[in-house]
A protein has these predicted regions:
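Short, internal strand/loop/helix patches
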Residues: 51-102
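N-terminal "domain-start" segment that seeds a small globular fold
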Residues: 1-9
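A mature extracytoplasmic/lumenal domain signature
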Residues: 12, 21, 56-58, 79, ...
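Extracytoplasmic
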Residues: 12-14, 47-49, 94
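Sec/Tat-exported extracytoplasmic proteins
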Residues: 19, 40-47, 87, 128, ...
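Short active-site neighborhood of thiol/selenol oxidoreductases, capturing the structured segment around
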Residues: 8-36
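Thiol-/selenol-based redox modules, centered on thioredoxin-like
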Residues: 95-143
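Structural microenvironment flanking redox-active thiols in thiol-disulfide oxidoreductases
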Residues: 26-70
């Protein structure tokens, strides 16, 4: 959150686990950020192949108490119209209710169900592990 504009294309070249929320970050946002961190850490040696990204969809100030927990996350402000052109929620859901997986080419290829709980997070972890195994030969760690 350096204040400098950043193009979404700079995120290419790495698997991404994205969440979208306003800067005020309500309880659902905090839960998604927690799950993103846990899912990434749960990948063990493959965690460096997956970036944890929070896309902030408004100009609200981020809660000071949340900043220390975001040390390994990439946090970017992105206009809502840009997000709507790139990501798509399930029918009847909001963009902010899902976690999204984006491939190294910059295409979102998977979203996890809205309101992910611990049981759902276990299934999501298995999906991410399969994805990392399947892409191991053509993906490189780090950007």
């Amino acid at each position: 959150m350096s204040g400098r504009p950043v193009e979404l294309s700079t995120l290419k070249g790495q698997w991404l686990l994205l969440s979208v929320a306003g800067g005020a970050c309500d309880a659902a946002c905090e839960n998604n950020l927690y799950l993103q961190r846990q899912l990434r850490e749960g990948l063990g040696k493959d965690k460096d192949r997956l970036d944890w990204v929070w896309l902030v969809s408004d100009d609200a100030r981020l809660p000071e108490a949340l900043l220390p927990a975001l040390g390994q996350a990439t946090v970017l402000r992105v206009p809502p119209a840009v997000l709507a052109d790139w990501l798509a929620p399930a029918a009847g859901q909001a963009l902010t209710e899902h976690l999204y997986v984006v491939d190294p080419m910059g295409h979102w290829m998977m979203r996890f169900p809205a309101g992910l709980d611990k049981a759902g997070a276990g299934r999501a972890k298995r999906d991410l592990e399969r994805l990392m195994r399947a892409s191991a030969s053509w993906d490189q760690a780090g950007r």
